[in-house]
Amino acid sequence: MHRSLASGTLRATRPRARQPAALQAAFQSDAKQRNKLKFDSSEAVDENGVPLANTLHENQEFLAHKKNERPIWTALRGKALLNEPSLNKGAGFTMEERETFGLTGLLPHEVHSLDQQCKRAYSQMQERPSPLAKYTFLSSLRDQNIVLFYSLCLRYLDSVLSIIYTPTERTLRVMYRFPARPDLPDVQVGEAIQKYSTIWRRPDGLFLSIAHQNKLREMMMQAKRPKDIDLIVVTDSEGILGIGDQGVGGQLIAQGKANLYTLGGGIDPSRILSVVLDVGTDNPALLNDPLYLGLRRKRVRGKQYDEFVEKFCDIVREDYPQAMLHFEDFGVSNAARLLAKYRPIQSCFNDDMQGTAAVVLAALVSAVKVTKSDLKDQRIVVFGFGTAGYGIADGIRTALMLEAGLTSEEARKVFWCIDRPGLLTSSHTDSLRPGQENFIRDASEVETWERDEEGRIGLLEVVKQAKPTILIGCSTMSGAFNEEVCREMAKHVERPIIFPLSNPTKLAEADPADVNEWTNGMALMATGSPFPPVRNPNGKLHKVAELSDRMITAGVAALARLAPCLQDPDESLLPAMGDVRHISVKVAVAVANAALDEGLSRLGRTDRFTEEEIRSFQWDPVYRPLELVD
């Protein structure tokens, strides 16, 4: 018997004499399946310790329907069991479980269903007066009862998603070197992240400080054993959208992303590790905060930073070879180059660059089908060319090369990219960030274009001169896609494609209702934040597609095929967020089978994946029976 580093639950060798034959079969068939696909750390052995055969589809139907009925074995009893969030059911413990685990006197008499508990918890959350208070409530709920937390979130996804994913809101003045908008109010973003050290109650996730870099492997083992991990979400907290460098508080953005993997993809939350690489902070508010919990020093950069990240990635590659490494909210100076360095040698993914790009590309594929045109014939303006903007452009360029057969130079010429210096051209080579040089226009092309008093070519001038068919916003500059810009674009394009992607809502470049009015209902839109439906010229309300990397595991084509607009041009470019688990299954099947086709799978199989098979591996927030280990 030992205590699991992953969850604190007690595990023990299961007493075979106490297991009925059907239960043994369930454990064994489940172990076979999990051992093959590396989705669980259970030892796939028989009673004699002999490894079980890796039969791929054996008992698949049983697993798909009975996975939530298999018992969990534990030696915890009484308050120790109630204090274990991965096992606690609160009022959901059955009478038999209360008797077995010594809980009868520790709980009120009535046994409540998970549905009843969700309704009560949602009512309690709604009574909280502010987004921060709601976030604190949900965080506390997760610390008490993991199943109830995720069940609540799935049932009320639209209500809680913005709270748990961009946790949560606070007044912030946007500082961006484009024309000021004094008429706009301060925006709200990331209050829980900014107040992390103030509201902190108990540790969650892994904190790797550069001050202890010689103990990285030891510290990682303190969190979870290598075989207990499928996914590692890591951030250095420098580039958190809208609020920038947040030091150790970036742990919350990593945890928020981990929550989305569970809610959207069905990944077992106990098999996800959220990590913050604490290399200091350049945020003066944090450095001067006496309660700040992170490393109190200026952010480490250069060679020392690279060596620290390399040591971490080496440990992940060597000790966690089956785990995917997810880079989250790294700064613009590091995101692209770190991905380029580690992508060829280990399974890694930059959400801000690749995830966002994949969803945008899926929406664009849907949009150009509505316009009855080809992606290669578009003229694309990207407004805001940081990590996300660059990732989107790079993703589209790659698609143009692979699918349309364009050369790299031909694909580059469809873009006009705007950042702090205005339109990026060959005259800006000294001030470009890594990767931006791949998308600059030749300065001679724009010699006659109008410039502002600082010599920059702005958005409106680019729209007038380039006549874009697609306008993508990643600037976090609220209101940048104003009436003049949208009407100018609509002069030259019958169905302008306009994606104000900055989030949260108050940072979006435009309100879809305004864009709809300014383009006479002809714009095809998708946003990075939720907005109310808009009314088309025929008077019909239709939902605006919300582009969110929380929907994507991979598979642009699979996602695009689900677009409602393919049946009705006035409908959304992407399916609703409430369908995210269903969508994730379809996308995962497409990606898994593509990996088989390209010889990239390490599973040694040739038979195709099915939706039922993928669905059987999704973790569901349900109460499984508990069995006591003597």
Give the location of each predicted region.
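Acidic/histidine-rich catalytic neighborhood
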Residues: 387, 422-423, 428-430, 435
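Metallocofactor- and cofactor-centric catalytic cores in central/energy metabolism, strongly enriched
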Residues: 36-376, 391, 395-396, 403-404, ...
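Conserved alpha-helical scaffold flanking the Walker A/P-loop in AAA+ ATPase domains
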Residues: 455-464
